[in-house]
Amino acid sequence: MPRLRPKPNATPDDLAFGINPCAMALSAGLVRSLSYLEETKNRRVFDLVDRAREEGIAVQAVTGPRLDELTAFGVHQGILVRLKTIEPVDLAQVAREAATASLVLLLDRVTDPQNLGAVLRTAVAVGVDAVVLPPRRGVLLTPGVHRASSGISFVAPVATPQNLAMAIRTLKDAGYWIVAADAGEGSTSATEFDWPARTALIMGSEGEGVGQLLLRESDFHVALPMDPRVESLNVGVACGALSYLWRRRWPLAPRSD
């Protein structure tokens, strides 16, 4: 009977593994050191090793068992990096300097790394100005999030204020309207909602939704219209749909280049 491997949930937060996350970490200038599988024949791994050496980053070849141990048997594809500190963005500064049309995402009790990874990919694709992650009410940037986002987590504008109530006050002071995703009675259909130019969108976990305190702090509640046989959507999927509804109302300015 094959031995079951433990899930990669015991790795330190200053690690990333897998080809795409490691490549993004290198591009973002966040790599302190790199380890790779000594018997690898993967050309993409060799390319990343060469890049790291050219940038003066410490590189080490390790055995397969050692790489498995370092990643807690995660799907590492033969490469792992240790990270520098990922500095959060200053939410107040972002709010002050954002364009007239600006979207900020606030995540309440989102604990699944896969969901956060999906949200961060959506955020960068849509052009969100900040993703607010409260330190005590959900998952932060972990190896699982880096892998789920294919490394987009290294370039996503993540803010980590003390709590979401404080973040909401900061955003309201900067002219944002607070919109909560809520499937409860009285919510406006998200497809018919007139999205404000400056929107702070609160997303809750699939199981619990947005907390009551945050719902009371919100200016509007919106819900995605769905077939009644579907009780709820994954927060990553719902966030993508709502973010693009906002972007449809407030398109990105054409690139000058």
Feature map (PLM): residue ranges:
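Active-site/ligand-binding-proximal alpha/beta "capping" segment
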Residues: 179-230, 234
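N-terminal positively charged helical leader segments and presequences
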Residues: 1-96, 255-257
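Structured adenosyl-cofactor binding patch, chiefly the S-adenosyl-L-methionine
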Residues: 23, 28, 125, 144-152, ...
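Short glycine-enriched loops at secondary-structure junctions
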Residues: 85-87, 136-138, 207
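RNA substrate-binding interface of SAM-dependent RNA methyltransferases
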Residues: 23, 30, 40, 47, ...
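Active-site helix-initiating loop/hinge in glycosyltransferases
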Residues: 18, 108, 115, 232-234
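Short, hinge-like loop/turn segments at secondary-structure boundaries
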Residues: 77-80, 147-152, 196-199
